[in-house]
Amino acid sequence: MARKGLIQREKKREKLEQKYRLIRRSSKKEISTAPSLSEKWKIHGKLQSSPRNSAPTRLHRRCFSTGRPRANYRDFRLSGHILREMVHACLLPGATRSSW
């Protein structure tokens, strides 16, 4: 189980990313269409003034049940070992376990 503080930090990052999403996209479009280098630097400075945690690359997917940050399956939003346990317990419809 992940620490509660780490999970709350991820939620805070998600909120910041949603809040600044349009601002970041519009400034990136302005950078690509700016004719001179000095204008690009001004727009880039505006982009840099936004919080670091508003960048989408700072987000990290976590397991829905345990909060584990690694080995997550996007379709189920679960980590690998929790997914395996749920499949073996027949809690996920449509998922089949492999047997050799």
Curated annotation (Swiss-Prot):
Organism lineage: Eukaryota, Viridiplantae, Streptophyta, Embryophyta, Tracheophyta
Gene Ontology molecular function, alphabetical: rRNA binding; structural constituent of ribosome
Subunit structure: Part of the 30S ribosomal subunit.
Similarity section: Belongs to the universal ribosomal protein uS14 family.
Name of this chain's protein: Small ribosomal subunit protein uS14c
InterPro entries xref list: Ribosomal_uS14, Ribosomal_uS14_bac/plastid, Ribosomal_uS14_CS
Regions annotated as coiled coil: none
Main localization of the protein described in the UniProt heading: plastid
GO BP terms, alphabetized: translation
Record function comment: Binds 16S rRNA, required for the assembly of 30S particles.
Subcellular location: Plastid, Chloroplast
Signal peptide residues on this chain, from the entry's feature table: none
Tagged with keyword Ribosomal protein: yes
Pfam families in alphabetical order: Ribosomal_S14 (PF00253)
UniProt entry keywords in alphabetical sequence: Chloroplast, Plastid, Ribonucleoprotein, Ribosomal protein, RNA-binding, rRNA-binding
Gene Ontology CC terms, in alphabetical order: chloroplast; small ribosomal subunit
